[in-house]
Amino acid sequence: YLVDFSIPVHSDNLAYTLNAIAHSNGDFTQPPHRGIGWSIFLSTFFSFVDSDNFLDYSNLSRIVSISVATSSIFLIYGVARKFFDERYSLVTSCLFAFLPHLNHNSIMGLSEPIFILTILASFYFILNNKLKFVTISLILAGLVCWIRLNGLIIFIVISLTYLLTFKKSQNFLRNYGIGVIFFILVLSPMLLQKYEQYGDPFYSSYQGSMFSENYEQLISNIDSNTKSSAFDYIQNHGIAAFFGNFLLGGFVNSLNILFQLSIPYLFILLPFGVLFSLRAFDQKSQYIKANWIFIISSILLMSVIISVIPEKRFLFFLMPFLVIFSVIPIQRVTEY
């Protein structure tokens, strides 16, 4: 009942839908400021639709988005089983399913639902040190890079999670190395296409302008093709201002955003969950450590982006991992 099927998509979801229509007609041109993974996924469904009414494509994108978001509820149950028994895994799924910000986003036809789903799947497989699971995890990390431009950050986060969690395990470097090869194979078609289009396999319209003082200046720099590198910022404002604005400022912005996303109920549970996770005895310490590494490294690596673009959507992918910590106090109160 939250979905209005009477109006077409607009803004970012309009661009994704138009790109998906183009893909279904054989045009795989990559836009300079967003990934094409979601639009390619949508195009597989659009290829079965023959309509002159754009509203039909808009509504199909919404339906697919809702379906993907719904499937994440089942996947987080599987991830939660690494931490809890069946009862509390079900609680984890329920808490995740009723997060209002994610529910609202899921009806928009945007890329966040499939982004979250793919990251969750990658994290699920990386919790196992067997070669086949590490390989699957890094293949999924490659798909994440297709979906969003910040997918490379997720690859680094997944890599850190694996390397720091399983550093004492036998063959962990061999498994990771083989997984990276598959990651590169998955990523290479996108990189080659970008190289053909822009002469740079890692091209983005934000490239060279990310270290702007604020979002307005970032857009102005992109429009005027003005470069603003980290070196330029340090030269003009000093190293202290650089760390204060992009690292500390981004970190504070991230915490503020996560607090807003934790309303209406996670903000009560999460502080206790964080505290109890430091002395977890009902969960494997290895998995708790992996969850901590994923959350902290994600916040730190996203700090520069969040300092300039404090957009809530950029941190939606962290919510499943915060929900896991939020279930720990429920388990403690119930069991002890």
Language model feature labels by segment:
Residues S11, R34-G35, H101-I114, E311:
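Short acidic/glycine- and proline-prone juxtamembrane loop motifs at membrane-interface regions
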Residues I76, G244-Y287, I299:
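Hydrophobic, aromatic-rich transmembrane alpha-helices
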Residues T92-P100, Y124, A141-C145:
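Short helix- or helix-capping micro-motifs
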